[in-house]
Every structure is written in C-alpha cells, then in structure tokens.
A protein has these predicted regions:
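Residues lining hydrophobic/aromatic ligand-binding pockets adjacent to catalytic sites
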Residues: 1-206
C-alpha cells in the first residue's frame, strides 16, 4: 500500500511545483479544492491538468467529494461550514473510499492551495479520516516531508501547551484541537456570494 501525500500549491511557479511532485514520485495529483481555479493561472484546472499530463502525472478532481465549500445546507452552522457535518456526508465518504482504492494503485498527492498543512482542510478535514487507512505525509515547500503524526503534534501544541493533561486523554485533546482549527479555517458564506462553481463527479476511477 502506498502512503498518501498532500501538497499546497501556495505561490510556487509551476516548475518548482512539478519538481516537488517528482521528488516524491507522485503519479496522481488529486485536487480537493472546491473551486479548482487560482489567481496563478498555472494552478487553474485547465492549465494544471494539461501541464501535469504533459509531464506524465495524472490529474483527478475530487473537489465535489472532498472540498470544504459545500452546497449541502446541512453542512453549515449559520454561515460557517462545519467539518464534523461534512465528514458525515455520503459524498465525502465516497471520496475517502476512492482515495483508499487509489493509493493501492499509485502514489497520490492531495492538492489544495495553502502552504502550511495546518492551514488547510486537506489536513484538518480529509487527512483526519484518511489516516485511518493510510500513512500520510505532507510535502512542504522546501521538499521535506512531515508525517501526519508530527503535524498532529504541532496541532496539539497550538491549543494545548501541556500535553500531559491529567483529566483528558491525548485523543480528547486532539479531537478538540481538530475542532478548534476547523472552526478557524472553515469556509464562511457571504450573503452576496453565489454557490461555488461545481464540476460534475468524475466517472473515471484511480
């Protein structure tokens, strides 16, 4: 079984982004952005898909299944998306199942925009559950890998200076840290903003 990787495109130029993927032998980039577009045109879906294909890397869009900006109203508390609710969606569960199937066949990197894994739903939402069926590693901008366990340690330290709480287990503290970070980074709908542009689910499999 291959590990699962994640990467944030950040403000990289495409050659640097490609070099990071090649450094870690990535065969498939799985885009988990709800809106697969960027102010950096080489990271918008049409250009990105073509450039990756030209360099022997496949592009798969799973923003509908695993994205953090949802159309389903039941995923919101007020105007804020709730990660716990998103995780219960059948469509989200389907996305996780596709990842599980995919990593048996290829080296996959989940891609979103944010540089730091802890600033992105790819870590705080998707990998919180993907870690149950795969080892997870986050590709940083300098090319170094961070295990998901180390990312969780950073997350825990952000909210719990004393990791040796006598009254709560590490799991309880970690679950609270996930929830708090999710609330901080979750998508908040704006009244004047229309629904996110969506792609139909892809019928192809990994």
């Amino acid at each position: 079984m291959n590990p699962l990787f994640t990467i944030g495109h950040s403000t990289h130029v495409f050659p640097r982004f490609l070099a990071l993927l090649q450094q870690h032998g990535i065969e498939i980039v799985t885009d988990v952005r709800s809106r697969p577009f960027s102010r950096l045109p080489w990271f918008s879906r049409p250009s990105l898909e073509k450039e990756l294909k030209d360099n022997g890397i496949r592009y798969v869009f799973l923003g509908l299944e695993l994205g953090a900006r949802r159309d389903e109203r039941e995923c919101y508390i007020g105007e804020r998306a709730d990660y716990d609710r998103i995780a219960q969606l059948p469509l989200f569960q389907k996305g996780l199942e596709r990842l599980n199937v995919g990593i048996a066949k290829a080296r996959i990197a989940l891609m979103c925009a944010e540089k730091d894994p802890l600033d992105c739903h790819r870590t705080i939402l998707v990998c919180r559950y993907a870690k149950e069926f795969s080892d997870v590693f986050h590709i940083h901008a300098d090319g170094k890998l961070e295990s998901h366990e180390k990312a969780e340690a950073r997350l825990l330290a952000r909210y719990h200076e004393d990791a040796y709480d006598l009254f709560r287990s590490r799991i309880e503290q970690l679950n609270e840290a996930y929830k708090r970070r999710g609330e901080e980074i979750a998508y908040v709908e704006q009244p004047e903003t229309s629904s996110a542009v969506r792609d139909a689910p892809w019928n192809d499999e990994f």
